[in-house]
């Protein structure tokens, strides 16, 4: 085996190791991006509830949807935002690590279960959210 053969073997091994390292870095970056994407969406929900505190009881306290048309429209808009967020998280739960997966599922199920506004909105627009029912 000549020196060029040895050099070629070293180059192949280096390329394989580099590919493995790049894959691992890419995978970590994808996980971090997914996690921070979920946190960003939840932060937007928090901002919405801070800006419109009158909507929060419809999602966390089981308050039924009633009131004037303006209030109803606002609650429906927030319900759409909440369901969009939930579907995004639900669709990516396999990327979120298993330790956090139970927490995400519990949060989604508990919020959905305690919110007539979400249930009503989802019943009207279920085809928009196919990922949530999987």
Question: Whereabouts are the PLM-identified features?
Answer:
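Membrane-proximal alpha-helical anchors
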Residues: 1-70
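An amphipathic alpha-helical interaction surface
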Residues: 64-134
């Amino acid at each position: 085996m000549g020196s060029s053969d040895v050099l070629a073997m070293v180059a192949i091994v280096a390329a394989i190791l580099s590919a493995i390292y790049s894959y691992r870095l890419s995978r970590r970056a994808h996980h971090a991006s997914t996690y921070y994407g979920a946190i960003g969406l939840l932060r937007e929900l928090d901002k919405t509830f801070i800006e419109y505190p009158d909507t929060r009881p419809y999602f966390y306290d089981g308050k039924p949807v009633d009131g004037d048309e303006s209030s109803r429209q606002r609650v429906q808009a927030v319900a759409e935002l909440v369901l969009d967020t939930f579907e995004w998280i639900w669709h990516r739960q396999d990327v979120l690590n298993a330790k956090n997966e139970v927490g995400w599922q519990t949060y989604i199920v508990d919020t959905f279960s305690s919110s007539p506004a979400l249930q009503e909105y989802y019943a009207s627009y279920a085809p928009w959210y196919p990922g949530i029912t999987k």
